[in-house]
């Protein structure tokens, strides 16, 4: 049986990973945020179809980069977890981009993989008080998102 000390040593996040996470100079799929914990970063992630890389970038306002109708004002903002963020897809392939093409107007994607309901809600409140606020909001909640609001360290659960 594994001891408590061995478990902690095995499940603790390594210093190098934390250094990249806290650095604004390193590309990372997640960037530190003092209020939310983290937000979407800029990275090439090897999680696409057949081992391909997904290109994930974020705009200055923290939204995932979009291609459709960027010059137009936005009436719809989306918030939530990895489904909202569209993990495992590249910029321009998100469901928000497909819906934007159908509606003929931009849709901002403020989703972040791993977010709990409260994190997504806090991000919604923060963003909607800025010039990036929208007339219509989509707050996506699914499955275990509510548990994520009470778990202190998901890393220890994922990497036991």
PLM region spans:
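Extracellular glycan-modifying ectodomains
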Residues: 1-160
